[in-house]
Amino acid sequence: MKYTVILEKGDKFGYVAKVPTLKGCVSQGRTKADALKNVKEAIEAYVEALMEDGLPVPVEVATDVVKLEVAAK
């Protein structure tokens, strides 16, 4: 399975990695690589827990990420 991960610079240090398709699945790390490694482990644990509980595993649907520039008034 593949999931989109959003990486954001942390407020105080490092990076935060969020998985929009898996609500509440978030991790962090000092570097981007650390954050991605950690969130991969979080995704695996999240999916495993769903399967153990007999719950459906969310499947990501195709999405487009678009940046729009807007004028401030």
Annotate each PLM feature.
Residues 23-32:
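A short, exposed loop/beta-hairpin motif centered on an aromatic-Gly-Thr core
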Residues 7-22:
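Short aromatic-glycine-(Arg/Gly/Cys) micro-motifs in beta-strand/loop hairpins
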Residues 1-3, 37-73:
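Short, charged, surface-exposed hinge/linker loops at domain edges
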